[in-house]
């Protein structure tokens, strides 16, 4: 393995089954060549230590004119296949700016943000206001290439009907009822939604205080996007002794800042939590 690829990242990707393109092991064998080809294609020089998330290697680089950027090389998986299109469509409006992309290699050249500063360390109410404000800024019409939320929840409803031993039936029935109601609204597939707007997916920037990164875009209801802000910072959520009130406050702040219907966002949060529980029960 190349010195540019951290061992921790290799360990994270090793053993992954194709989703649906290539296994983690096979991709790791190709990764050093992908990096070298991308550095050559865009005339880049590595300018710092590699970073990574769950499914992508990120290298700080300098372009031929000396300007700073990052090279992102993603393990091919379905959720990320249209990331470059979403970033291109936003054009830097609320999200990291796309400088170049090679979809065949699953590589992107992106503006460099402050990777050491994310919303995880910002006071929770302020962080939720930032998330809501960027949800409003990222509100653009859906691209025709994107997968549709209506199709995703139709598949989910079928799974809910077959039951799940680890999940109380009342939760499954509640999620099914909510889906039946939510899909009747014309907004269901209308907007391009960043579906993983949790605190680590916002980085500090120079041209505005915060920008979103790592979109997993979906043609969806904007209210679907609020749920990930409920998933993290759990110690704060339970510290006050009233978990429900704390989570509802987070959601309320986000919805007020984003201009979203809070009841609709709450309904989607229940559906998404049940969906996550089902995936967890299948070893995902």
Please place each PLM-identified region on the residue numbering.
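Active-site acidic catalytic loop and adjacent metal/ATP-binding pocket
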Residues: 51, 56-62, 70-71, 98, ...
């Amino acid at each position: 393995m190349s010195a540019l690829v951290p061992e921790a990242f290799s360990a994270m990707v090793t053993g992954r089954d194709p989703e649906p393109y290539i296994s983690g092991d096979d991709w790791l064998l190709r990764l050093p060549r992908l990096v070298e080809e991308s550095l050559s294609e865009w005339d880049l020089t590595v300018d710092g230590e590699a970073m990574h998330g769950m499914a992508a290697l990120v290298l700080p680089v300098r372009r031929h004119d000396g300007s700073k950027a990052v090279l992102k090389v993603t393990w091919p998986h379905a959720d990320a296949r249209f990331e470059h299109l979403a970033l291109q469509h936003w054009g830097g409006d609320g999200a990291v700016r796309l400088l170049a992309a090679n979809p065949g290699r699953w590589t992107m050249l992106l503006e460099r943000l402050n990777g050491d500063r994310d919303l995880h360390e910002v006071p929770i109410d302020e962080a939720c206001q930032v998330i809501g404000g960027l949800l409003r800024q990222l509100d653009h019409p859906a691209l025709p290439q994107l997968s549709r939320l209506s199709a995703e929840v139709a598949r989910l409803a079928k799974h809910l009907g077959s039951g799940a031993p680890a999940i109380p039936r009342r939760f499954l029935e509640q999620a099914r009822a909510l889906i039946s109601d939510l899909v009747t609204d014309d907004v269901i597939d209308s907007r391009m939604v960043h579906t993983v707007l949790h605190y680590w997916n916002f980085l500090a920037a120079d041209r505005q205080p915060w920008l979103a990164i790592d979109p997993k875009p979906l043609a969806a209801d904007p209210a679907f996007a609020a749920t990930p802000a409920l998933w993290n910072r759990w110690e704060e959520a339970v510290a006050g002794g009233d978990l429900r009130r704390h989570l509802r406050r987070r959601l309320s702040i986000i919805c007020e800042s984003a201009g979203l219907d809070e009841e609709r966002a709450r309904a989607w949060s229940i559906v998404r939590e049940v969906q996550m529980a089902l995936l967890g029960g299948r070893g995902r």
